[in-house]
Amino acid sequence: MRYLTAGESHGPGLTTIIEGLPAGMPLLAEDVNKELKRRQGGHGRGARMRIEKDQVQITAGIRHGKTLGAPVAMFVENKDWKHWETVMSIEPVPEKNEKSRRVSRPRPGHADLVGGMKYGHNDMRNVLERSSARETTVRVAAGAVAKKLLHELGIEVAGHVLEIGGTRANLTRDYAVREIQETSEASPVRCLDGVAAEEMMQKIDDAKKNGDTIGGIVEVVVGGVPAGLGSYVQWDKKLDAKIARAIVSINAFKGAEFGVGFEAARKPGSEVMDEILWSKEDGYTRRTNNLGGFEGGMTNGMPIVVRGVMKPIPTLYKPLQSVDIDSKETFNASVERSDSCAVPAASVVAEAVVAWEVAVAVLEKFDGDRFDTLKKHVEEHRNLTKEF
């Protein structure tokens, strides 16, 4: 299973095409729209979220609420397009209009300058329109489809915010996936710790007042995962590696860790490895989950626990120093409409990309042509691993 996305931030809209879904899987537009709505929420979002009310148009691959086994095409309209029709026109426009909203002062930390160098664009708008996090709209749409597939197989995905601007949630226990879903949805910053959430919101407000931005850390937990997804036999078959790649592919994300993550470097092996248990009711389990649900690049039946770190958004309302590519003189960088903090929304994007990789791994391991046989094979596998 794979997908491609297309579209610019201020173009007519964004498109994704998914290939490889099994036939007969239940899927409605509402399954996607509820995830799009979640992405648009969160304390710290900018003015654009008051303009865009994202709704998906499914244009291919579904009939009467079920997948056909053919490619699924989805489109999300950009409501703000009407204000950008000339600037972002597909057809040629007069030269004076062509230079309208031209960007010649790249923003530090963004794709602007290097993208312009790479593709020969003397207007960095050609770069920023595609590199914008607006593209994550259709990544969330694709992830919503993956989450639906996993849900039907008894696999659930939840994300939450661990840290914003140096304020970290004080979590003294593990949370079940359902509990994470319910608690994070009730928080304006998707944080499980109400006290920390208040401090996070204050830091976001302070950053906005100062024309600045702040980043943070999100965590995604996947429960009900069968053992044996991914493989140890080749480096590029390891599922944790694929998930790590997916996490750092999200705009502004700079790292990923599983389980205790980098803390493992500071502990002896006896405090890191998860002891193996067995019972007739549950089969093989682990006493702890320090490795985040992975051993040898494969799922071990414990919940997947992965975290991603997001840098502050590079668009600042008090811009940093840059250089004009025409005159080579020093100026302040260009300013584009942006958020002061998008960490809560990014947790939804992280859910989507993790769900996608897990769904792909499921389809790689089990028959993916028909959804009814897929469900049967997953259940048979659960029983086999329990009896091993």
Curated annotation (Swiss-Prot):
NADP(+) binds at R39, R45. Pathway: Metabolic intermediate biosynthesis; chorismate biosynthesis; chorismate from D-erythrose 4-phosphate and phosphoenolpyruvate: step 7/7. The keyword 4Fe-4S does not apply. It catalyses: 5-O-(1-carboxyvinyl)-3-phosphoshikimate = chorismate + phosphate. InterPro entries: Chorismate_synth, Chorismate_synth_AroC_sf, Chorismate_synthase_CS. Residues 95-118 are annotated as: Disordered. FMN binds at R130, S131, S132, N251, A252, G296, K311, P312, I313, P314, T315, R337. Keywords: Amino-acid biosynthesis, Aromatic amino acid biosynthesis, FAD, Flavoprotein, FMN, Lyase, NADP. Its EC number is 4.2.3.5. GO terms for molecular function: chorismate synthase activity; FMN binding. Reduced FMN (FMNH(2)). Its cofactor is FMNH2. Gene3D superfamilies: Chorismate synthase AroC (3.60.150.10). One of its GO terms (biological process) is amino acid biosynthetic process. GO terms for cellular component: cytosol. Homotetramer. This reaction introduces a second double bond into the aromatic ring system. Belongs to the chorismate synthase family. This is Chorismate synthase.
